[in-house]
Amino acid sequence: MSNMDFLPISKEDLKKRNIDVLDFIIVTGDAYVDHPSFGTAIIGRVLEREGFTVGIIAQPNWNNIEDFKKLGKPKYGFLVNSGNIDSMVNHYTASKKKRHDDFYSPGGKSGYRPDRAVIVYCNKIKEAFKDSPIIIGGIEASLRRFAHYDYWDNSVRRSILEDSSADLLIYGMGEKPIVQVSNLLRYGMKIDSIKNVRGTTYIEKDISSLKDYIEIPSFEEVSTNKKSYAEAYKIQYYEQDSIRGKTLVQKHKERYVVQNPPQPPLSQEEMDEVYALPYARTYHPMYEAEGGIPAIKEVKFSITSHRGCYGSCSFCALTFHQGRVIQNRSQDSILKEANMMTNMKDFKGYIHDVGGPTANFRHRACKVQEKHGTCKNKQCVFPKACKNLIVDHKEYLSLLRKIRKIPNVKKVFIRSGIRFDYLMYDKNDEFFKELCEHHISGQLKVAPEHISDKVLNLMGKPTRNVYDSFVKKYYDINKKIHKNQFLVPYLMSSHPGSDLKAAIELAQYIKKMGYTPEQVQDFYPTPGSLSTTMYYTGINPLTEEKVYIPKDQKEKRMQRALLQFSIHDNYDLVKEALIKAHREDLIGNGPDCLIPYNKPYKKSHKKNNAKNNNNHYNKNNNYNKNKDISKKNKKNSLSKHKKRK
């Protein structure tokens, strides 16, 4: 592909297109990948469709002001985002250690973007072009639009609008608001006069003219009073709906952050239009010499079928970004994309995914949402299914069958998360059966996250019984279709509410599973999530109940070690945790014991894998099917718990 297949990135590109001055310049923390899985590509192509000229400055050197000047000054303004991931999450692990890789950068190497990229980029743009309007968007801006707890500073920060000095913030999915804002600018309206576009947030000195709004506790209040913080979050959480949501206001000293209500979800026709735009569907050729951009590998042959999620997991901030209302593409649109993929030169016959935030949420949760919006204080699937929930996989199954029939398609995988409780609510097993038969490559990844019901309740996840039922049904179906397929459970340690007792309960469950899960992570308090509010305040803002928070680093390491108790290096931490919790009964050689009395000699990794009854996964998350594992071990260690998720 040539540069002409992409949006312009240089003065040379502008010259070839006979563009003297660009209308907009997008500055992004990611490398430039022109694919609909990347927000920069979508916004750029949407604006191009509307008749605007758009240039891209990807990962500018923030220490060199000239990098921000290389495309000149835009006619209407700069659009700034940190990339597909919050820059702090991208750069640091849950234990605040620096990451050494970055899948959204050339060659997968880190160091191409600054911490707090949106703020840094905006400050540099103001330095280069003092009076040029700046509009911020994307995940980093969207989830930091109000005063928010910042895990890396361990303090409450102001709205990112204040810290970045941007003129306007677009939150959530930005196609509709950016078109409306850009057209207002084209008609001659000044950026500081644009105050009525849904899905936008701005700073205001005087709110006397505002009507029908809710004022939440101020920055000064939430930064000094945790109850006020919890109250502010609760109001934000309840008002994220395009039909019933109100304008929200939060005072920051003498000014006010004003959030207009969310934009209505995209219609199916609008979704189809967005995904039919002329994307190059790969990274810009300028990265070829550096090894390309690793992030394209997972999405190049994946299809986004819908947006939104009504699962409402507490640790996920999707409610604040994509929303709870499902927005889906038509089958025709998806089939056209699948057919197009088969004509790409590097297509090998495998479509890696057809899904969204939750693969099997292909339609709205209920008909009530269409007229009245999402319920204010009630969830669709938690703690149990709402009586109005539409449980039906028929349309999704129909779509998958059609894709499977496309010439040159060998296999269609589903790698987006499957919501197993929703799957269990469906009395028709047809989808479940075909999922196992056609759409899994030996294993299905599922996210029970924990097994203690008190922790699951705080996570917004279904109870252990639901998961156990799913596990059993999964293996029953696989047995019937004569497939030896496994489950890979994602598990989380140190979530709010999880104490050592809960972690030990999970460790005992893992012991019965018969293998050590690799998909384990510590809870990561990222901006915008309900769980992060619990972590900071020690309060569940929705119930106002106090919540136990494991903040001590030693305890957090113990909880994580318990989830991988059979790993040699974790022995001391596990033993210390069991003694601290007065669970010495789990130390010894009995069948229920987690560890022996004495620390065993450390074996080589290769040798340990061959003899380990826990049957570690290999690096590709496949079960290590070593010949040394007897059939008896396989049967007893694995078959019971393959059913999970």
Swiss-Prot record:
<protein>
    <recommendedName>
        <fullName>UPF0313 protein CLM_0251</fullName>
    </recommendedName>
</protein>
<feature type="region of interest" description="Disordered">
    <location>
        <begin position="598"/>
        <end position="645"/>
    </location>
</feature>
<dbReference type="InterPro" id="IPR007197">
    <property type="entry name" value="rSAM"/>
</dbReference>
<dbReference type="Pfam" id="PF08497">
    <property type="entry name" value="Radical_SAM_N"/>
</dbReference>
<dbReference type="GO" id="GO:0051539">
    <property type="term" value="F:4 iron, 4 sulfur cluster binding"/>
</dbReference>
<keyword id="KW-0004">4Fe-4S</keyword>
<feature type="compositionally biased region" description="Basic residues">
    <location>
        <begin position="632"/>
        <end position="645"/>
    </location>
</feature>
<dbReference type="GO" id="GO:0005506">
    <property type="term" value="F:iron ion binding"/>
</dbReference>
<dbReference type="InterPro" id="IPR024560">
    <property type="entry name" value="UPF0313_C"/>
</dbReference>
<dbReference type="InterPro" id="IPR006638">
    <property type="entry name" value="Elp3/MiaA/NifB-like_rSAM"/>
</dbReference>
<feature type="binding site">
    <location>
        <position position="309"/>
    </location>
    <ligand>
        <name>[4Fe-4S] cluster</name>
    </ligand>
</feature>
<dbReference type="InterPro" id="IPR023404">
    <property type="entry name" value="rSAM_horseshoe"/>
</dbReference>
<dbReference type="Pfam" id="PF11842">
    <property type="entry name" value="DUF3362"/>
</dbReference>
<feature type="domain" description="Radical SAM core">
    <location>
        <begin position="295"/>
        <end position="566"/>
    </location>
</feature>
<feature type="compositionally biased region" description="Low complexity">
    <location>
        <begin position="610"/>
        <end position="624"/>
    </location>
</feature>
<keyword id="KW-0411">Iron-sulfur</keyword>
<feature type="binding site">
    <location>
        <position position="316"/>
    </location>
    <ligand>
        <name>[4Fe-4S] cluster</name>
    </ligand>
</feature>
<dbReference type="InterPro" id="IPR013704">
    <property type="entry name" value="UPF0313_N"/>
</dbReference>
<keyword id="KW-0408">Iron</keyword>
<keyword id="KW-0949">S-adenosyl-L-methionine</keyword>
<feature type="compositionally biased region" description="Basic residues">
    <location>
        <begin position="600"/>
        <end position="609"/>
    </location>
</feature>
<comment type="similarity">
    <text>Belongs to the UPF0313 family.</text>
</comment>
<dbReference type="GO" id="GO:0003824">
    <property type="term" value="F:catalytic activity"/>
</dbReference>
<keyword id="KW-0479">Metal-binding</keyword>
<feature type="binding site">
    <location>
        <position position="313"/>
    </location>
    <ligand>
        <name>[4Fe-4S] cluster</name>
    </ligand>
</feature>
<dbReference type="InterPro" id="IPR022946">
    <property type="entry name" value="UPF0313"/>
</dbReference>
<dbReference type="Pfam" id="PF04055">
    <property type="entry name" value="Radical_SAM"/>
</dbReference>
